[in-house]
Amino acid sequence: MEQGLSKHILIDESPGETRVAILKEGKLSDVFVERQHRPALKGSLILGKVQAVKKELNATFLDLGGATGYLEGIPKPSPIEGGALLVEVLSEPIDKKGARVTANFSLLGIMADITPNQTGYSISRDIKAKGRRASIRELLSNVIPKDIGVFIKSNANKCELAELEEELRTLLVDWERMQLDIVSGGQPKIVKPAASLMELRGDWRKNAIISQGKDGILFKKFNIDAQISGALESVVETQTGVVLTIEEMEALTAIDIDLASHKTAHSHPLKLAETLAEEIFWQIRLRKLSGIILIDYPRAKNLGARDHFHSEIKRIASQDEYKLVVHGWTRTGLLELTKDRLGPSLRDMFLCKNSVSQFLIEVIAIEACRTLITESDGIANPQLVCSQDLKSALLGPLRKTFDEVKRRLGVEVDFYVDLYLAHDDFYIQAKKTT
C-alpha cells in the first residue's frame, strides 16, 4: 500500500450487484451493496399518494409505490387524502416500518443546492472574501427565482462565476422538468431516482487506493466474504481473548463483554478499556447497528476502567462520520448509545429475518450467477443444480440478472432441482445428454 494511504477500497461489479468494501489498515471497515432488482429509495424524489393525515400523531402517511412513507409533521397547505405530495426519501423502509420522507427536499449540485420549497440564500462560511460573497449574491439575485432557496457550497469558492451560473441554471431546468412530470399525474411515481452507489459515495476516493474487479474475484483475493460472514456472527473473540456477544433485536442491540479468558484484565485495566472501545466501535460501524445500543461492561474494583472505556468510545465516536451518540451509564450500569437508522443493518442486507445464519435467497442467487461465470468455462451445456427456491429466484425477481449471465456465457443454462439440497446449496455440472 502506498505510503500515507491507510484506506483501500475494493469495488466489485457482478451481474445484478455492485459491492464496495472499505479496508482500513488491512481490516474490513465498511460494506455497501447495491442490487439491481431492489433499487435504493433513499435520496430519491417521489410523487407520493397521500394515504392519511393524522393530526393526533402530527404525521402524514404516503404510498410511495411498492413502499409506504411517513412524514413527520403536516405540510402547509395541509395535503388531501388521495392527493399527490412530492417528497424526498430520507431513510429506507425496513420490514414493516415505512420510509422516512421530507417535503423540504433539495436538488443537489457540486457547487450549489437549490430548495424549491424554501426561500432565501445561504453561502458557505468557508467563502470568506467579502467581494466574492457580494459577487455570488448578485449572481443569485439575477438567476434564482424569489420562491426558490439556494445554498452555495464551499466548492464554489474558487470557481469562475460563469461555471456557478451554469450549474444553477441546470438545476433550475431539472426542477422545471420535474414539475412537468408532476403535472402529468400518475402518482405514486419516482420523479428523480436515487443516486447510484458510485455517485453517492464519490467522497470514498479521497486519500484512498481504489481497486476495481468483476464477478467476485477481487473479494475472494482479499477474503472479504469470510470477513462479512464473521461480522454476521453473534459471538466475536477479539485478539486479546475477550469474548463479545452481540445480540441484535428489532428495537435495540445488546453487547456483552466477557473477560474470563483475558489473563491481564486486572493488571492492565485502562489499556484493555481502550482496546475494547476501539473493537466495539469497529463492530458497531461494520454491522451498521442503529437504534438503542446497550453495552454491559464488567464491573470491577477499578471503577476508573469503566469510566475510561466510556470516555474512549465517546472520543472515537466524535472523530468518526458514523454519528454514533454516546449518552452515558444507565441506572442498571449499562452504557447507552444511539444511532439514527437510515438504512439496513449488515444482517438485513445478507440474512433472512429472524435468522442467525440463513442467507437471503437473493444473496445465494447472485453468488450462483458469479459462480456460473467464473466456473462454467469449457462446459458446453452448463447445468445449475440447486433448490427450488433458488431456481424460482433466478427465474423470477432476478430474471434480468440470470439473462445477463447467459448472454455473457453465450449458452443456455439448464436447471436441475435437487430436493435434498439446502436453501443455500448449489453446484454446476455439465448437462447429461440422453
Model-derived features with residue positions:
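S1/OB-fold single-stranded RNA-binding interface
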Residues: E2, K7-I11, G16-K24, V31-F32, ...
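Extended, charged alpha/beta regions that create polyanion-binding interfaces
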Residues: M1-P39, S44, I94, T102-K146, ...
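Short loop/turn segments at strand-loop or loop-helix junctions that form parts
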Residues: P77-E81, P116, K153-A156, I257-L259, ...
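Hydrophobic beta-strand segments of well-ordered beta-sheets in folded domains
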Residues: D147-I152, P188-K189, K206-I210, G291-I292, ...
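A generic structural motif
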Residues: G149-N155, L334-L337
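Conserved glycine-centered short motifs in functionally critical loops
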Residues: N58-L64, P93-T115, L171, T240-L419, ...
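Residues at the N-termini of beta-strands
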Residues: A52, A59, A84, G149, ...
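Short small-residue beta-strand/loop micro-motif enriched in glycine and branched aliphatics
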Residues: D30-V31, G69-E72, G120-I123, A254-I255, ...
